[in-house]
């Protein structure tokens, strides 16, 4: 079989203990359909098939997609040779589960796709770059737009660290498992999302600036007005965007 393709960000993981751990984190039952993104050689696919009713494996690499079905004859595996960003998630049953070892270059797009989909998964388990996993699960004091964007839709927690040397070829950095349990109701109402993110982006556009400056320039509001607004919400104008909780941003957005 051909080796990993650098252009597709492919890194093979064959450590059985880690693969079992990733599959276990998803809480898969015998009734579940699992969407696997980028199954590669099928090492994780094997663990998913042991647990799930069905696995839908979306693989961009035509060579790998062609070979995968032959590795698992007589199973409930469906292989789709397609870019996950163009895959219609509405084709999946409700409450499906996503498990994936995701190429680093496409991580943010995949998270956005899944968390904002009309047919959202119940649980998302991703093996991604360690730094990105930790940013997703950040708390006030270390927040980012990525963390806010994920956490309004899901409860995020971290799983195990997977050292780079366990992959073939080894990536330049370690990876980490991150688990997103989708919320029944997003923290921000759909009708308020546009306003909410306009304000959050204004705060983070110059993340090292204090809020009085970043919100003033980003929202085109005078600094005294920003200070009064923040004070009314119990927020210091000397704080930075990374210091605020999602609830803080929700409180601020209600005045717009």
Please give the residue ranges for each predicted region.
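Catalytic cores of RNA-modifying enzymes
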Residues: 1-202, 231, 242, 251-252
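C-terminal lobe and adjacent flexible extensions of AdoMet/dcAdoMet transferase-like proteins
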Residues: 200-256
């Amino acid at each position: 079989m051909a080796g990993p393709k650098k252009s597709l960000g492919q890194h093979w993981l064959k450590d059985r203990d880690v693969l079992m751990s990733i599959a276990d984190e998803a809480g898969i039952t015998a009734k579940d359909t699992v969407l696997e993104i980028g199954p590669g050689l099928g090492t994780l696919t094997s663990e998913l098939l042991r647990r799930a009713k069905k696995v839908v494996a979306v693989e961009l690499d035509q060579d790998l997609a062609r070979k995968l079905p032959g590795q698992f004859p007589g199973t409930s595996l469906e292989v789709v040779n397609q870019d996950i960003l163009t895959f219609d998630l509405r084709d999946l049953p409700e409450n499906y589960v996503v498990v994936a070892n995701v190429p680093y270059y496409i991580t943010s797009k995949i998270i956005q796709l899944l968390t904002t989909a009309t047919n959202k998964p119940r649980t998302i388990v991703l093996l991604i770059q360690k730094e990105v996993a930790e940013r997703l699960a950040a708390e006030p004091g270390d927040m980012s737009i990525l963390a806010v964007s994920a956490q309004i839709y899901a409860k995020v927690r971290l799983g195990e660290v997977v050292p780079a040397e366990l992959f073939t070829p080894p990536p330049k950095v370690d990876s980490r498992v991150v688990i997103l349990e989708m919320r029944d109701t997003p923290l921000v109402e759909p009708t308020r999302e546009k306003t909410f993110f306009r304000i959050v982006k204004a705060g983070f556009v110059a993340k090292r600036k204090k809020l009085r400056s970043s919100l003033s320039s980003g929202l085109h509001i005078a600094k005294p007005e920003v200070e009064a607004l923040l004070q009314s919400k119990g927020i210091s104008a000397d704080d930075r965007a990374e210091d605020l909780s999602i609830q803080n941003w929700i409180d601020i957005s209600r005045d717009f």
